[in-house]
Amino acid sequence: MAVPKRRMSRSNTRHRRAQWKASTPNLVPVTVDGVTLRVPRHLVPAYRRGLLRPEI
């Protein structure tokens, strides 16, 4: 595990953390019960198997 050699200032720490940005999930179309929905790719199998119900 990486260990810092020197202490990082509060200013540098906050500037570094401020660069992180959340990205929107890539939505893909999936048809469930005759209704086409746009859902995140990793949830498509759950919708197809019926583990998640579409909220319309």
UniProtKB/Swiss-Prot annotation:
InterPro entries: Ribosomal_bL32, Ribosomal_zn-bd
GO-annotated molecular function: structural constituent of ribosome
Ribonucleoprotein keyword on record: yes
Biased composition (Basic residues): 1-19
SUPFAM superfamilies, A to Z: Zn-binding ribosomal proteins
An annotated GO cellular component: large ribosomal subunit
Biological-process GO terms, alphabetical: translation
Keyword Repeat part of the UniProt annotation: no
Keyword tags: Ribonucleoprotein, Ribosomal protein
Stretch list, region Disordered: 1-22
Top-level taxon of the source organism: Bacteria
Family to which this protein belongs: Belongs to the bacterial ribosomal protein bL32 family.
Protein name (database record): Large ribosomal subunit protein bL32B
Species: Streptomyces coelicolor (strain ATCC BAA-471 / A3(2) / M145)
Gene expressing this chain: rpmF2
